[in-house]
Amino acid sequence: MEPRGAAAGEPEPAVSPSFQARLWKNLQLGVGKGKGGGGGRAGGPERRTAATPTPSLPPPKTTQDVGSTGSRWSGFKKRKQVLDRVFSSSQPNLCCSSPEPLEPGGAGRAEQGSTLRRRLREHLLPVAKGSSTAAGTVGVTPPGGRSPDSAPSSSASSSLSSSPQPPPRGDRIRDEGTRRGSPEAHLCHQKSSSLPGTACLEQLLEPAPPPAEPARRPAEPQSLQKGEELDCSQKINPVETSNADVPLADPGMYQLDITLRRGQSLAARDRGGTSDPYVKFKIGRKEVFRSKIIHKNLNPVWEEKACVLIDHLREPLYIKVFDYDFGLQDDFMGSAFLDLTQLELNRPTDVTLTLKDPHYPDHDLGIILLSVILTPKEGEPRDVTMLMRKSWKRSSKFQTQSLRLSDQHRKSHLWRGIVSITLIEGRDLKAMDSNGLSDPYVKFRLGHQKYKSKIMPKTLNPQWREQFDFHLYEERGGVMDITAWDKDAGKRDDFIGRCQVDLSSLSREQTHKLELQLEEGEGHLVLLVTLTASATVSISDLSVNSMEDHKEREEILKRYSPLRIFNNIKDVGFLQVKVIRAEGLMAADVTGKSDPFCVVELNNDRLLTHTVYKNLNPEWNKVFTFNIKDIHSVLEVTVYDEDRDRSADFLGRVAIPLLSIQNGEQKAYVLKNKQLTGPTKGVIHLEIDVIFNAVKASLRTLIPKERKYIEEENRLSKQLLLRNFIRTKRCVMVLVNAAYYVNSCFDWDSPPRSLAAFVLFLLVVWNFELYMIPLLLLLLLTWNYFLIISGKDNRQRDTVVEDMLEDEEEEDDRDDKDGEKKGFINKIYAIQEVCVSVQNILDEAASLGERVKNTFNWTVPFLSWLAIIALCVFTAILYFIPLRYIVLVWGINKFTKKLRSPYAIDNNELLDFLSRVPSDVQVVQYQELKPDHSHSPYKRKKNNLG
């Protein structure tokens, strides 16, 4: 007699909807518990109705019972329990619990199943009252498909074996389990939708038998495309086992090291038959890496490395390739998926991915070559994703906190060193413009950090002399990409060349002068590169406080003592910031709450706290430590509201100069608006400590300030333009008023004042020496100092500037409201008035410089000859006559001019002379044009006659 397991490969009919409905109804209502004796009814599955529960198991050992049992259970076995469904990542696994160990069992052995399986079995498969069959024997079926004690029935067996029926449930599970070579194979799937499939439920109700058959060769893994559906009987085949470790199914932290090697035979998207490809890596709709752009190449070589931290392997790595188009939307060049569950742990794997376009699956788009290593992470990873982010997205509370800060009470250093780069010059760069020159600038990139140099116009040998720093996150340093570009206004910048610097090959604590040859171009770049040890930049919990540890505090004080002046001159001091809590923050969500987190910035160092959800009074209790490079820097603490679908909302900001900090004092700072011109809602409690070397700080003052890499772009604002104009006008008016005062002394408007000024002038000029100029400034500073310490502070609050700032803030508030009283036309007129005033001032300043230039250019020869004569006379006077006599004569002339000619018009001879020299605009206006003979009346008449 052929066993029923032989028909395992035959096609099985689909499950009828009515059967699924009945089974699901049984699961919901539990009608089987009250119908223990209803299972002995004769008839096959055709007689079962919706009110009939799943048949119970009869007592074995009789041929009649076995035959009836086979008849009743054939309703299950004639129908393949298939329910096609798409995996859902939003629902838990409802039909499968954790896998239980599978042991061979007999008729009298109790089942060691889970509580969920036992409850479902009691609910769906009730045992008949008075039955001698133990519950533990349910589903434990030998290979013949019968109970161990049952006698074979010729009639029942022949009828079952002659028809192409599916194997019994136990055989089918055992066959699939042995094919996979894993006891966990009886799990239907790890993810399911909201309703469990009938096959999964039936599989759950019967414990899997022991592997009685020899294991078969595992089937080849099948790749799953997006939108493809799976059924419960068609399980995913795992990768063939090897000696290497296989990723666990349980969630855990992994590190995925990816090396993007190259691309081959990529698609051409540009008109010239080439492309400018770059690659994006995404995991779960989040971009985790973007490569550099390889210009005009269909076989690009990147050789870039990326390190990605992932907390599960369910999401595949999504690779997308694009063609860069300046000013336009980048063209799609293909995509591919990498199933992370197929990777072996701690083993480098070379991967070749074929790019496909979902809309055009038949197109050949080339391949991408990668090298990947998947390693499990133990403990909390260092946070390398929290710096210099422009927006913050929320995935989940656990993920956000684990990505940002360590939950353990320990200190977490964020980077392991600093690479200081000085861009000196470029030599013999390639000419990209039609005039034989270029407008070069340089871009630097190290991981996610970027820097762009200033543009040097019209030169092939630019001198930049710029210095900046990058953070090192890896011990080996990494590779820094450098590209040179030519700036073109109004169109795409031209690529000049590229080069790379392998930082791992450079020794630390030493300055290296590098002359780098540009690849794919011409010329050299000259750099100075210095790798330093780890800076004092870290995040820790409040329980780990460097300043409260007496021994560590002594080490910090010793490091910045006055005796260690020349030890790392750039390391000026140490800053520790305790971000304790905030109170009364602004409600940014519709629920009346906020999800606040805090950003602490010191120049280009930018650190974040974790997010406290649904709270207007958050407590962070975090300690930040920074390395001070400039004691004149300003510490900025900004509070944001984390938003799920867009960039973070601003809640408040406070700016604190380092020199104004009182060490060890916990202080509540009132939050201000974005412009720091007025208060906003909420306060933040901080405790700050600053330790620095005064000599290093003084020397650093004479060096240019560090430029911030991330700055908000300035927008055109009427109030801002008006404010700057008024400030400039006030500065100029100081000089104008001083000139008016001196002129009033010359005019004898007040005879006593003019007489006193005349006598003072004679004494000062007669006894004047050049050293008296700095002495006068020193006396002025000393006088103001004694006024301040004596309580006679003559400094007044600048109410004019405050009023302007308040007006600017009010103007910003009014701009946000639709019902503004002032019309758009009035705004245009107000802006026009300010612009006209600025235009006139700029015109006068530019005209003055152009007139001086045109004087020496002999634009007007008469004036140039006159200037030569005047300069000769003044040269002779200065050579033969002392300076004090010249100034004395000039002063006497000015003081007596009004007395000699009361109605004379005051003037300045030098400015009067320059007013006669035309500016460049006037030169063009005064230029005589040559007549065009083609437009002469005579030629026009001659052409008409022809």
Swiss-Prot record:
Residues 31-43 have a biased composition (Gly residues). Ca(2+) 1 binds at residues 270, 276, 323, 325. Gene3D superfamilies: C2 domain (2.60.40.150). Ca(2+) 2 binds at residues 270, 323, 325, 331. Expressed in the brain and central nervous system (at protein level). Isoform 1 and isoform 2 are expressed in the brain, kidney, liver, heart, lung, skeletal muscle, testis and spleen. Isoform 2 shows a higher expression in the brain, heart and skeletal muscle. Binds Ca(2+) via the C2 domains in absence of phospholipids. It is a multi-pass membrane protein. Its cofactor is Ca(2+). Residues 143-163 have a biased composition (Low complexity). One of its GO terms (biological process) is regulation of neuronal synaptic plasticity. Ca(2+) 4 binds at residues 433, 486, 488, 494. The keyword Amino-acid biosynthesis does not apply. Ca(2+) 6 binds at residues 589, 641, 643, 649. SUPFAM superfamilies: C2 domain (Calcium/lipid-binding domain, CaLB). GO terms for cellular component: endoplasmic reticulum membrane; membrane; recycling endosome; synaptic vesicle membrane. PANTHER family: C2 DOMAIN-CONTAINING PROTEIN, DYSFERLIN-RELATED. This is Multiple C2 and transmembrane domain-containing protein 1. It comes from Rattus norvegicus (Rat). The lineage of its organism: Eukaryota, Metazoa, Chordata, Craniata, Vertebrata. The gene is Mctp1.
